[in-house]
Curated annotation (Swiss-Prot):
One of its GO terms (biological process) is cell adhesion involved in single-species biofilm formation. The chain crosses the membrane at residues 4-24, 36-56, 68-88, 94-114, 129-149, 155-175. One of its GO terms (cellular component) is plasma membrane. It comes from the Bacteria. This is Uncharacterized protein YhcK. InterPro entries: Diguanylate_Cyclase (IPR050469), GGDEF_dom (IPR000160), Nucleotide_cyclase (IPR029787), Rev_trsase/Diguanyl_cyclase (IPR043128), Sig_transdc_His_kinase_LytS_TM (IPR011620). Keywords: Cell membrane, Membrane, Transmembrane, Transmembrane helix. It comes from Bacillus subtilis (strain 168). Residues 223-357 form the GGDEF domain. PANTHER family: DIGUANYLATE CYCLASE DGCM-RELATED (PTHR45138:SF9), REGULATORY COMPONENTS OF SENSORY TRANSDUCTION SYSTEM (PTHR45138).
Amino acid sequence: MLKELFVNLTILITFNYLFTHLFKERLVHKKDSISFQAVKGLACGLLGVILMVFGFTYQHSIIDLRNIPIMIAALYGGWVSTATALAMITAGRLLITMNTSALYSVIIICIAAIPSLIVSRRKKVQLKHAFYLLIITNSLISFSFYFLIDLHSYELHLYFWIISIAGGMLSLYIIDHETNAHLLFKQYKFQAHFDFLTGVYNRRKFEETTKALYQQAADTPHFQFALIYMDIDHFKTINDQYGHHEGDQVLKELGLRLKQTIRNTDPAARIGGEEFAVLLPNCSLDKAARIAERIRSTVSDAPIVLTNGDELSVTISLGAAHYPNNTEQPGSLPILADQMLYKAKETGRNRVCFSEKKE
């Protein structure tokens, strides 16, 4: 008896790791499509059937931890997942043996699912809620053991309660821990690659992308691309006059407009305080010039709304260079683009300067 319950516990723990690896951050919300909720329910239902197969028979009744998969389905999937898991577990139980005990167990497990569904409506389910659910479901199961199918073994009830509560609490702890760890990993990964303020690449990720593009240019005949540097005109004055929080708002809006103007495959980055850069792979010289002008006009034509409601007209200066039209060495593009950016600032700002130099 204790051995079979322990086997159930080890199966449960193994499933929890597989479950979190399969669904990852999708476990933190239940607003999935019905089909995806059904997939969660199928996984929990399969677990319930496996637990019954590895349970033990006591006076024509199967004793196992199938109540825990129902709780997992409700808390991390919703009503569709719960209904799917219940259907699988019910069918599995009736197929194993069809008797009075099986019918009682089906009724009890369906009733036990109701508190889990009620708790699942909470935005955040804590371990204490899981503990309360286990107390309720275990009480229902013990009631069925004792009064409906005459299982009066106090040793059986004690072992079941200990293993069930341990398994249920451990299950939710593992799922929560693994899910939070995955979300934290995603957050760290995002912070390693993206600028936290604007949502575009940071300097390090942009340099990695640029080096990869240099290598592609060296390996691919007739490959062409452009590099655009841009700088917000008089940004220091904006910070001094409106404050750094409004300066941040300008940076955010520029990042947003930049992403809306270029292709999804064009890497954009914030490489300095108010300096941005864009790579245009597989882009001709004429097309790159048009894109640069479109970026400039997108920023200058519409004022930026600050957090205090004021509208601020902002302009940018852009410098650009193209491979192979401006140079035969891809690695020299940053120097040429930076020179053109300096020229754009020196000749009046709010303009695009494209390199005409051929090295």
